[in-house]
Amino acid sequence: MTKNTRFSPEVRQRAVRMVLESQGEYDSQWATICSIAPKIGCTPETLRVRVRQHERDTGGGDGGLTTAERQRLKELERENRELRRSNDILRQASAYFAKAEFDRLWKK
């Protein structure tokens, strides 16, 4: 059974800072992460993801989306869904009123 622990942004930043400051003491970044993760109380993989995200946010890393870009993308996708829903409602209303007008003209 896994436990979900939410860490505050300060704890996350401190953990990433500890990894970055301690890299010279270990053979690899993964070794650094594996030694620091138990001290923080998270899994090494969770800490690795945080370090990678920090690297992307500060201009390094593998070219993934920064946190701000990810947030903006999420907002744009939400807006896109709402606009599609609105267009669908307008399309259905237009069809309904066109049919009503056609029926009115036909009955004359």
From Swiss-Prot:
GO terms for MF: DNA binding; transposase activity
Q: What are the TM regions of this chain, as residue ranges?
A: none
Q: Which Pfam families match?
A: HTH_Tnp_1
Q: Which GO terms describe its biological process?
A: DNA transposition
Keywords (A to Z) from UniProt: Transposable element
Q: Does the keyword DNA repair apply?
A: no
The family annotation for this protein states: Belongs to the transposase 8 family.
Annotated protein name in UniProt: Insertion element IS629 uncharacterized 12 kDa protein S4062
Q: Which organism is it from?
A: Shigella flexneri
